[in-house]
Amino acid sequence: MSHNTFGHLFRVTTFGESHGVALGCVVDGCPPGLALEAEDIQAELDRRKPGQSRFTTQRREPDQVKILSGVFSDDRTGGRQLTTGTPIALMIENTDQRSKDYSEIRDSYRPGHADFTYDAKYGIRDYRGGGRSSARETAARVAAGAVARKVIPGITIRAALVQMGPHAIDRANWDWEQVGQNPFFCPDAKAAALYETYLDAIRKDGSSVGAVIEVVAEGVPPGLGAPIYGKLDADLAAAMMSINAVKGVEIGDGFAAAALRGEDNADEMRAGNDGRPRFLANHAGGILGGISSGEPVVVRFAVKPTSSILTPRQSVNRDGAEIDLITKGRHDPCVGIRAVPVAEAMMACVLADHTLRHRGQNGERP
Amino acid sequence: MSHNTFGHLFRVTTFGESHGVALGCVVDGCPPGLALEAEDIQAELDRRKPGQSRFTTQRREPDQVKILSGVFSDDRTGGRQLTTGTPIALMIENTDQRSKDYSEIRDSYRPGHADFTYDAKYGIRDYRGGGRSSARETAARVAAGAVARKVIPGITIRAALVQMGPHAIDRANWDWEQVGQNPFFCPDAKAAALYETYLDAIRKDGSSVGAVIEVVAEGVPPGLGAPIYGKLDADLAAAMMSINAVKGVEIGDGFAAAALRGEDNADEMRAGNDGRPRFLANHAGGILGGISSGEPVVVRFAVKPTSSILTPRQSVNRDGAEIDLITKGRHDPCVGIRAVPVAEAMMACVLADHTLRHRGQNGERP
Amino acid sequence: MSHNTFGHLFRVTTFGESHGVALGCVVDGCPPGLALEAEDIQAELDRRKPGQSRFTTQRREPDQVKILSGVFSDDRTGGRQLTTGTPIALMIENTDQRSKDYSEIRDSYRPGHADFTYDAKYGIRDYRGGGRSSARETAARVAAGAVARKVIPGITIRAALVQMGPHAIDRANWDWEQVGQNPFFCPDAKAAALYETYLDAIRKDGSSVGAVIEVVAEGVPPGLGAPIYGKLDADLAAAMMSINAVKGVEIGDGFAAAALRGEDNADEMRAGNDGRPRFLANHAGGILGGISSGEPVVVRFAVKPTSSILTPRQSVNRDGAEIDLITKGRHDPCVGIRAVPVAEAMMACVLADHTLRHRGQNGERP
Amino acid sequence: MSHNTFGHLFRVTTFGESHGVALGCVVDGCPPGLALEAEDIQAELDRRKPGQSRFTTQRREPDQVKILSGVFSDDRTGGRQLTTGTPIALMIENTDQRSKDYSEIRDSYRPGHADFTYDAKYGIRDYRGGGRSSARETAARVAAGAVARKVIPGITIRAALVQMGPHAIDRANWDWEQVGQNPFFCPDAKAAALYETYLDAIRKDGSSVGAVIEVVAEGVPPGLGAPIYGKLDADLAAAMMSINAVKGVEIGDGFAAAALRGEDNADEMRAGNDGRPRFLANHAGGILGGISSGEPVVVRFAVKPTSSILTPRQSVNRDGAEIDLITKGRHDPCVGIRAVPVAEAMMACVLADHTLRHRGQNGERP
C-alpha cells in the first residue's frame, strides 16, 4: 500500500475530495473477460449511500457511478459488457456540496479530525466537508470492491455491525438475513431494535458513538497470502485500518487470543472429505502463517465515534488561539454503520489481489 | 508491503529459514553519512536473542551479525564507519540447527502452525524448525530496525509487554526502567513477579500463553503518514500484523474507542508553547487521518499462545490420515516476550520510511 | 514502472481508450502548494493536439482537460489554485469518436499494430481506433507532464524532431526558436522546409515514415538518479520506450559511443565557478553511473513509421484466414511528430520523481 | 524498477561493492518446486568471471556463489534441491580486493566514471574499485539470471557481441556455436579473429573501446508484457540501460526503423500451423504494443568504451583543483565483452517476471 494506491496485481488508485468536482478510482490489473455493468457497481454504492435513514448523514448524494474505460461490448460479446484487461476508471460526480460558509472549519482544528495534521503535513487543506480526509472517499473503494468481487466469484464476502457503543450483539442470534433488514447492518434483530432507541438518543444529544464491524469471507481457498510482508492478515490489517476512523483490527480471536492457553487456541484438524483437513475450530480466523487455511477469513475492526459532535470542545485555531468549538453540519451519529459495505469492498480487493498473486507465482489455486 | 520486502523509500528485504545456512536482510534506501557499526546492530539483536532466560527457547544462537555492504570508513571519516546510501546487507549465520530427526513435523500438520498452509500454497516446505515461517526471521527485522533508528535520531521508541495470558499489568505502576530488569520486558515490577510464577507453571505444564505488547514512539513530529493507503496507522497495522503469531493490532484507545461517545474520545487542544497545539489527551494514539499529530504514537498488538505444546492435539498428516500430535523441541512458552524488541524494530522501520517519504514530498519535517 | 502506473514518489496512473468515454490520469504524490490551473495543462495539450496541420491525423478532438481533484483555492490562496498534496485526477472526454463501421479492424490483425498481441494476451480487445494501444493515451501523459513541470521549476525541458525518414537535420542549424514555427517541431528551418515536401509526398502515397526525437533537460542539478535499478537513464529509457511506436532510446552519444575509444569518450573536467566541475564535453548526456552530472540530460529515441498505410499488406484475421489489408481512417503520416511534446512530458515526470526521491533520501538537492 | 530492486513478481534485490566483504542478491517470488543447485548458478557466473583471457580485467575472483536460503532437499525430493517459494539469497564473497593505495581515486574524479556524481548525490563514496558503481555488481545479476532461467524452461536466451569499436560483424556469418569459442562472445568467427588483433592494439595503447551486444530470446509465447508502463520493451530497455556503461538500447530494427517507410517496416503475416499467425519478418523484434508476438525478442544495446585508460585526461579533484589523471589498475579494454552474459541474465529476469505477471492476471500462457 502506498499513497493513494493499494494492491499489487489488482491495484486500486482513488482520488477526490468531499466537495470537489468528482471522486473515483482507477482499477488496474483486473483480468479481462469479466462481465461488468455500471449497475453491478451501483448496487454496492447504493448500500453505502448516505441519507438512507435518519441514522446516517442527511447529505443527499445520488452517488451515480460512470465507467470511463476498461470495458467493451459488441456483437461478439453478445451485448454483455466485458472487462478488457485495461484500467477501469470509475467516476462519481459530487452534486450536493452545499457551497456554504466554511469559515469555521477553515480556521479551526476540530478535535478528533485530521484538520491539524493535514495542515501540519501539507500546509494547505481543502477543508470543505473534510476534503480528502472525508469518509466520502470510501465511495471509490466500494466501487472498486464491486469490480473485485467479479474476480473471485467463488468467494462470499459479508460484513455486519456487531457492536454499537458498549452494546455487543448476542452472537447466538446471528442471522445474515437480518443484515439487510435494519438500518445498522446488524445480524441480531434484537440488538438492532435496541440500537434504534440507543442511537436516536445519541443523535438527539448531538453526540456520537463507536462501533465494531465483522467481515467474513467464505469459500476462500487455502494458499492465499504472500509471506512475510504481504501476509494475507497483514494486508487485511492495513486495508481495514486505512478506513476512516478505524482504530483497531483483529483476525479470528484477535485480542482474546492473548488470554488463551495453547491447548485452547489450537485449531485441531480431522480428515476432510476433499482431501484437505477439516478444522474443528477457527480461532485463527482462516489464516495461519499469513496464508489462508480454507476456513472462513474473519476480520473485526473498531471504529471510533464520529468526531463531529454538538457538545463544545476545547481547541485552537490556525493562528494558535484557543477556542471552543462545536461541529455543525450533516454527520453520521455512528460512522461505523456505513463502514460495513466499505469493509466488504476492502476484503474483496485484498482477496482479488492475492488470488492473482497466487496464480502468478504458484500456478492455479488449490 | 509486498512479499519479502517492506517499506517504500526505506526498504527492507529479509531472507532465510530457521535451520538454513543463514538469514538476514538488505536495507535499501538508508540515507548516507550515518554512523553504523556492527555493534549497534548487535546490541539490538542481543535483546531478542533466544536462550537468555528459562522463559524463552533454549536454542543457543549467538546471532552474530555481519555487515556485508553499504558502509565505509577511511581516514576522512575519522575512522567511523558510515552508511554510503547503497544497500546495507546484513547476515546472521545459523549455528545451532540440531540436524536431528524431523520426520515427525515433516509429515504432520501441527495445529496452529503454518505447516498445512505452506504446503497448500507451495507444495513443498522446509519443515526444519518451521523454515521460513519460524519467528527466527524476526532477527533480520531487529537488525534492520537498528539501522532505522539511525535515520530518526530524535525519536525514542520503546516497547513493553503489558499483558500475559489473562493478566494485564497495572498501568499505574508503569516504569520504563523496569523493562530491562525482568525477563518479560514488563514495565510493572509487580506484574513481572506474578508472571514469573505464572509462566513457570505454564512452562512446566508444557503449555503456552498469549500476550499483549505496547510500543510507544515519542518525539514523532507531526506530518508523517501518507493518506489514503499509506496512512501511518495502516502501515503500522501491517507491520505489526506481519510479526509471527500476532492476531490483533490497535492504535491509541483501539477497540475500547468503539464503546466511547464522541465527547469522551475527542482529544481536546490548547495552545502549545511551540506554536503547535498541545493535546489534552491522546485517545487517538498520536495519529489523526493517518498522519502523526506530534503526540506519542501508541500501538498495541495481541500475540496468540505459542502453538507448540506438549498436550496431544488432534490433527492430520500430509496423507490425510488422522493423528494425535504433541510438539516436542525447544520453544518459547510465551512467544510474545521476544516480540517486544521486534515491535520496536518494526516501529523504527515504519517511522524511518515515513520520515523519508515526508521529506521527499513535503520538504523538511515541521 | 508497472502496469498503468509509473513513477515512485511522483506517480502517474493513466486510463482510457481511443474511442471510449474519456481518458485521463491520476497524478499522485505531487507536492502541495504549487500553483496549477487547467490552462497550464491545456497549453501543453494543445501542442500535442491532433488536426493542427495536414501532417497529423485529421481527427478533431478539443482535448479539453478537467481537473477533478487535488487542487484548492480560497481567499487565503489569493485566488490562485494550488495543489494540496492529494491525488490530482485529470480527465479528457472523447468527443470525435466517429461511431463508424469497425468491422474491418474488428476481425483483422493489422501488421505492425498491437491487434494480434492484445488478442493473444487478453482474448478481447477494444478495436475502435486501437483502443488502449492507441497513441491517444499519450494525451494523459502530456497532462501529467504539465503538472510535473511545476515540481521542477528550475529545469528547462525541450524536445525536437531531429530526423524524419532518412533525413537528419543539420545540427549546425539548431535553433530552439524554430521548433514552434513549423509543424514538425524541427529546430532546423532548412530541414523543416525539406520535410514539408517530403512528408507531403509520403502522405499522398498513403505511406508513412519514422523519425528520431531528441529531448534535452537543462538545469538538472547533479545527484538525481537511484542506482542500481532506478538509475536516471534506466528510468528515462523505460519512459521513452513506453511511448507508442518507439523502438530505440539512447543517452548522450548513445550507439555512436560504441565506436569511440576511451580517450574520445571521456568528458574531461575543469574547475567550475560554482565549486563543481565544469565538463568540457557531454558525451555522457548528463548522466554518469545512473546519476545526473549537472550537464544537460540528452535523450534521443527512434519512432517507427506509422503502421496504418494505404498499401495493401498480407495478414490474417482472427479466424486464421489469410487476407490482404489496407488501413483506412485518419492517421499521422509521421507519428513521430506528435511524440515531441509527449517526450517532454515523460522527461518532466521522470525528473520530478527523481527530484522527490533524492530529496527524500539525500536531503535537499545540491 | 526502484533503487536496488527490479521486477514485480519475480523480484531481484542486489547488494555489494567491488571491494567490500561480499556481494549478492535476494531473488524473491521464484515459484516453488524448481530444481536449483549452486552449480547451475556457478556455470553462468563462470562465463562472466574476470581474468579468463587477456582481454578482460586481470583481477582474479573465483566468484564462488553460496545459496543462503530458499531451497530445500530431503528424501522426498529424491535428493534434488528444490526452490521453496521463499526468498533465495545468493552470496559471492570478495577475495582478491588488493587493499592497495587508493589515495588517487579517493580524491580525484575520473572522467567518464561515477566518482563525481556519487559524491554529488551521497557526499560519501566507497571509491575502492569503484564501490557500488563497479561492474562487479553484475555478478549478482548473472546469479539471479540463472534462477530466472529455471522459471522459463521453454525459452532460449542467447547473447552475442555484434560490434567492437567501429567494427560490426557480418551478420551473414552468424553462428551461435562460435559464441563460446572465442573470448569475445562473437558469433562471427572472422570478426572474432579481427577483434583479437584490434583489441590487442587497444590494450597495449592503454586505451579502450566500446561495443554493441545483441540478445535474442526464442520460444517466447505471445502475450507477455504489461501495457502501458510495464511494456515488455520498456522493461527490457530499463533492464539493459541499467547495466554499467550502456548508453543505448533498441528493439528489433531499432534506430534503423526511423529511416523506413511503413510498407517496409510492417511485419506481414500468413496463417501459421499452430493457429497463430506466422510472421514473414521481425522488424518489430518480437514486440508489438509492448506485448510479445511469439517471434524472437531481439534487443541490442551499446556499451561505451571503458573509462579507465592510461592516456592522461584533464579533471578536477574533490577540492576543486585541476589535475591530470590516468587510471591505473586492472581493467577491461572492452567492458562490453563481459556484458554479454549479463544481458542474458537481464533478459531472463524480465521474461520470468512477465511470465508470472501474465499468468497472474490472464491465466495460463497461450
From Swiss-Prot, chains A, B, C, D:
Catalytically driven reaction(s): 5-O-(1-carboxyvinyl)-3-phosphoshikimate = chorismate + phosphate
Record keywords: Amino-acid biosynthesis, Aromatic amino acid biosynthesis, FAD, Flavoprotein, FMN, Lyase, NADP
Keyword Cytoplasm (UniProt): no
Signal sequence bounds: none
GO biological process: one example: aromatic amino acid family biosynthetic process
Pathway named in the protein's UniProt entry: Metabolic intermediate biosynthesis; chorismate biosynthesis; chorismate from D-erythrose 4-phosphate and phosphoenolpyruvate: step 7/7
Family annotation (NCBIfam families): aroC, PRK05382.1
Known partners and oligomeric status: Homotetramer.
Protein task: This reaction introduces a second double bond into the aromatic ring system.
Family assignment from sequence similarity: Belongs to the chorismate synthase family.
UniProt name for this protein: Chorismate synthase
Lineage: Bacteria, Pseudomonadati, Pseudomonadota, Alphaproteobacteria, Hyphomicrobiales
Annotated gene: aroC
